[in-house]
């Protein structure tokens, strides 16, 4: 760990980083190297939800509907929030539940804002079943979700705009933005 990263870790004081953004934005693939560089633990909230439910997210949606999934997601987020020094890859819709924001803001919220065209390409190439895109027009569904969630994601402490950067490059960008946020937490940062 470099001296700068060690200093950053000390200044974070154990506060967790919560990565938010649309499905396919790279929260998990960015979160792993970010956690490793900071010497933090890494948690994929969706994986914890699946473990808690004993089934996949599409199965949870099918069995309990979106409302049931969101309730479980909030419970899992509260459990994760009891720990410190984590990088947490959240689910794409975590920001839609007002009760989640108190916990998210106990740490530092980082929005991975993927350029819409790039996001569509990523999701088309990904074999993961996305319950909210199981419609006749997935592109229209994605655009509707983006329009609904953008103002919510914009409440993040840091925004990192992503086009074709690798997850490691995105993690490095977050590490470069964090010191200025810690100096002046009233200023949201965008890269």
Swiss-Prot record:
<keyword id="KW-0547">Nucleotide-binding</keyword>
<dbReference type="InterPro" id="IPR027417">
    <property type="entry name" value="P-loop_NTPase"/>
</dbReference>
<dbReference type="InterPro" id="IPR031322">
    <property type="entry name" value="Shikimate/glucono_kinase"/>
</dbReference>
<comment type="function">
    <text>Catalyzes the specific phosphorylation of the 3-hydroxyl group of shikimic acid using ATP as a cosubstrate.</text>
</comment>
<dbReference type="GO" id="GO:0009073">
    <property type="term" value="P:aromatic amino acid family biosynthetic process"/>
</dbReference>
<keyword id="KW-0460">Magnesium</keyword>
<protein>
    <recommendedName>
        <fullName>Shikimate kinase</fullName>
        <ecNumber>2.7.1.71</ecNumber>
    </recommendedName>
</protein>
<dbReference type="GO" id="GO:0005829">
    <property type="term" value="C:cytosol"/>
</dbReference>
<dbReference type="GO" id="GO:0000287">
    <property type="term" value="F:magnesium ion binding"/>
</dbReference>
<dbReference type="Pfam" id="PF01202">
    <property type="entry name" value="SKI"/>
</dbReference>
<keyword id="KW-0418">Kinase</keyword>
<comment type="pathway">
    <text>Metabolic intermediate biosynthesis; chorismate biosynthesis; chorismate from D-erythrose 4-phosphate and phosphoenolpyruvate: step 5/7.</text>
</comment>
<comment type="similarity">
    <text>Belongs to the shikimate kinase family.</text>
</comment>
<feature type="binding site">
    <location>
        <position position="28"/>
    </location>
    <ligand>
        <name>Mg(2+)</name>
    </ligand>
</feature>
<dbReference type="GO" id="GO:0005524">
    <property type="term" value="F:ATP binding"/>
</dbReference>
<feature type="binding site">
    <location>
        <position position="70"/>
    </location>
    <ligand>
        <name>substrate</name>
    </ligand>
</feature>
<dbReference type="InterPro" id="IPR000623">
    <property type="entry name" value="Shikimate_kinase/TSH1"/>
</dbReference>
<feature type="binding site">
    <location>
        <position position="149"/>
    </location>
    <ligand>
        <name>substrate</name>
    </ligand>
</feature>
<dbReference type="GO" id="GO:0009423">
    <property type="term" value="P:chorismate biosynthetic process"/>
</dbReference>
<feature type="binding site">
    <location>
        <position position="46"/>
    </location>
    <ligand>
        <name>substrate</name>
    </ligand>
</feature>
<keyword id="KW-0028">Amino-acid biosynthesis</keyword>
<keyword id="KW-0808">Transferase</keyword>
<keyword id="KW-0057">Aromatic amino acid biosynthesis</keyword>
<keyword id="KW-0067">ATP-binding</keyword>
<comment type="subunit">
    <text>Monomer.</text>
</comment>
<keyword id="KW-0479">Metal-binding</keyword>
<dbReference type="InterPro" id="IPR023000">
    <property type="entry name" value="Shikimate_kinase_CS"/>
</dbReference>
<feature type="binding site">
    <location>
        <position position="92"/>
    </location>
    <ligand>
        <name>substrate</name>
    </ligand>
</feature>
<keyword id="KW-0963">Cytoplasm</keyword>
<dbReference type="GO" id="GO:0004765">
    <property type="term" value="F:shikimate kinase activity"/>
</dbReference>
<feature type="binding site">
    <location>
        <begin position="24"/>
        <end position="29"/>
    </location>
    <ligand>
        <name>ATP</name>
    </ligand>
</feature>
<dbReference type="GO" id="GO:0008652">
    <property type="term" value="P:amino acid biosynthetic process"/>
</dbReference>
<feature type="binding site">
    <location>
        <position position="130"/>
    </location>
    <ligand>
        <name>ATP</name>
    </ligand>
</feature>
